C-alpha cells in the first residue's frame, strides 16, 4: 500500500539506499555484495554532486598542485646541477687561488 504523495520509484530508491548502507556497514559480506553497495553509493554521490564542483573543487586544485610540485622540483634540480658543475670546475681547474696551486707554482 502506498501513502499519498509516494510513488513506487521513490520507495524503491529508499530501500536500495538502506540496503547499500547495511551492506557497507556489515563486516563479513561477499565481494560481489560489496561491489554492488559501493557502486550504488558512488552513483548516489555522483547524482548529488554538481559537475562544476567536481571540476573546480577537486580536479583543478589537484592538477595545479601537481604542476606546482613539478615546477618546484625542476627548479631545485637545476640549482643542484649548477652547484655540482661549479664544484667540478673548481676541482679540475686549480687557478682559483688555492694555496696548493700557489705552492706548486713557487717551486
Curated annotation (Swiss-Prot):
Keywords: Membrane, Transmembrane, Transmembrane helix. Residues 85-107 are annotated as: Disordered. It comes from the Eukaryota. It is found in: Membrane. GO terms for cellular component: membrane. Its main location: membrane. It is a multi-pass membrane protein. The keyword Zinc does not apply. Disulfide bonds: none annotated. The chain crosses the membrane at residues 19-39, 53-73. This is Small leucine-rich protein 1. The gene is SMLR1.
